[in-house]
Amino acid sequence: MKVKVLSLLVPALLVAGAANAAEIYNKDGNKLDLYGKIDGLHYFSDDKDVDGDQTYMRLGVKGETQINDQLTGYGQWEYNVQANNTESSSDQAWTRLAFAGLKFGDAGSFDYGRNYGVVYDVTSWTDVLPEFGGDTYGSDNFLQSRANGVATYRNSDFFGLVDGLNFALQYQGKNGSVSGEGATNNGRGALKQNGDGFGTSVTYDIFDGISAGFAYANSKRTDDQNQLLLGEGDHAETYTGGLKYDANNIYLATQYTQTYNATRAGSLGFANKAQNFEVAAQYQFDFGLRPSVAYLQSKGKDLNGYGDQDILKYVDVGATYYFNKNMSTYVDYKINLLDDNSFTRSAGISTDDVVALGLVYQF
């Protein structure tokens, strides 16, 4: 019975991102759930910038309220707290998600706040590794991952007419510099800035666990970004396509992304053009073991003074063992295939392997 339960639970955990959110309140159409995890995590690497303790905790709240038969309000907040430094250290906690919205029956939903960019609707399919992965893009990287000030419209099953056909439309306001003409109230460094932008995604669950998706995003770039060593242009564009198979204990996913002035090249700026590729494969055994293998590559084209260079390139081999729905342990080995050269050194890109070992309690 235990192995049967595990075989049903684990895929659900991977999709939901939480093992079994604790229901705090559910009465009169109002519901509030608490979820989170504590990851006792250690990295082993020759790269002294990452080697050592990486323990952290995440905590989130999801709520919804039934306004009438067709209208539901909802909100979500998620927070990350690092636990690998002294109690007096700074910059050890931050908000990952914070948004509120309304769902209008089959007409779709609209929300605003800090949320995932629509490009992640497709690239998330390969972001399933035990520890690493999902790093041909990053947070606060236009609409490629978590981002500030995004207004998102989502529609599931195409107004209730086509099962499995989902689409989204998104707008992001400017997040500029700390001071000067391009300043905004939440100013940040050039690599994290963005001008006004929009994006869209379409995903379709075709049949028998097979899904396909496409996403596009276009954002204005800031003056600060165009003053960086790499990357020049008025706009940052992202085109993404992906395929996924998730059935019969097998998980296979791949995505290809082509960007223009949108993929970070370490600390130097943005690649004028980049080709990003990720593929991941996993198998869920009934007794709780989930081995994983993946390949990720981001290649920058025509990098000023450096030509074509790999920005990221590695093979990932790992495994997770689920004791039950709340407790798991994992090992993840990142086999770095980058060469140590003038570009990686100038950009501050590590070329060392990393092994991650973690013990996780989640709820």
Swiss-Prot record:
It is a multi-pass membrane protein. Residues 1-21 form the signal peptide. PROSITE patterns: GRAM_NEG_PORIN. Its main location: membrane. GO terms for cellular component: cell outer membrane; pore complex. GO terms for biological process: monoatomic ion transmembrane transport. The keyword Iron does not apply. Belongs to the Gram-negative porin family. Forms pores that allow passive diffusion of small molecules across the outer membrane. In K.pneumoniae it has been shown to bind the C1Q component and activate the classical pathway of the complement system. This is Outer membrane porin C.
